[in-house]
Each structure stands twice: as C-alpha cells, then as structure tokens.
Amino acid sequence: MNCWKTINLMKDYGAVRIILTAVCFMILVFISTFLAFELLRPGTSLSDEYVSLFGGLLVVILFVHKVIHVLPIICKKRKIEKKFYILRMRTWKRIPKTTMLISLVSPFLLITPVLFYAALAFPNHAHYFCMISGIHAGYCLPDFLLALKLIKAPKTAFIDQEADGLDILVEK
C-alpha cells in the first residue's frame, strides 16, 4: 500500500477558520430549521422550561454522534481500535473509502431529521431542538470537510487514521 494523500484539516484550513466556519454553519442551520418549523407550525408559543434537559440532551447527542460514526465500520466487521477518549476516538484502520464516507455523513443524516421531528412533536420546545440541531451541524463540519476531500480519492482507496490526520492508501 502506498500513501496517495494525507489529509490534515488543521494544517489545510487552520483551527480558527474551522471554528469560525462551524459557528457560521451553526447559526445558518439554526435559522433555517427554526424558520422551517415556524412555517409548519405558525403561532406556536415557546416555553423556556427544561433548560437543564436541553444541556443534557446536547451532551447525549454529541456522544451518539461518535457512536453513529462507528456503526458503518462495525457493519463491515472491520477490526477497530477501542480507545475511547472524551469525544475523540481513533478507530480508523484500513477502512474502504465508501465505508468511510458513509461513516462521516451518517451522524448528520440520522440525527438532524430526528431533531427536526422532535421539534414538530414538541412544538413548545422546538427552539431547543433547533439549537441542538444547529450545534450538531457545526460539530459535523469537520466531517463534511473530510468527506469532500475523500470524494476526490480513487474508488479502491483505503483510509487509515494517523496522529496527524487521515492517510489515503492505494494499492500499487
């Protein structure tokens, strides 16, 4: 296996740019989801109860995000390294490109619709679900940036996570 390319988001974009883009993306997603909710349920009165539940749900969503990342890899029955750090897991060893792409975008595609449905189901607390959805979307931004870079890789490539980023491996 040869290394086709190494992806390091901090080196490519910089931490400040990623954070600023993530915050802008959070605000954009919050505004768009809240406006969509208001179009579907106009005139709903919002309640400011259960703020602590909002904080707890936010923490749970971030951990569920990490678990959903691992599910496509488990479905492929790949050997994964089980080092669970707080919100940081090093699990990627020789993962096929398509599996890695699915793993990167699946948290956003699974969690965001659930949060929007929860906003419709509990209209008095919709602003909480829209905020969590926005925060989660900002948390997904590095995954989207990695996915955009992986799309350009050869179809038969494998992904290996190293300490400084991801390596895209191709066979000779």
UniProtKB/Swiss-Prot annotation:
Primary location: membrane
Membrane topology term reads: Multi-pass membrane protein
Q: Write down a Pfam family by its short name.
A: DUF3267
Disulfide-bonded cysteines: none
Cellular component (GO) terms are: plasma membrane
Record-annotated membrane-spanning stretches: 18-38, 54-74, 102-122, 128-148
Location comes to: Cell membrane
Q: Keywords of this protein's UniProt record, alphabetized?
A: Cell membrane, Membrane, Transmembrane, Transmembrane helix
Stored InterPro entries: DUF3267
Name of the protein in question: Uncharacterized membrane protein YhaJ
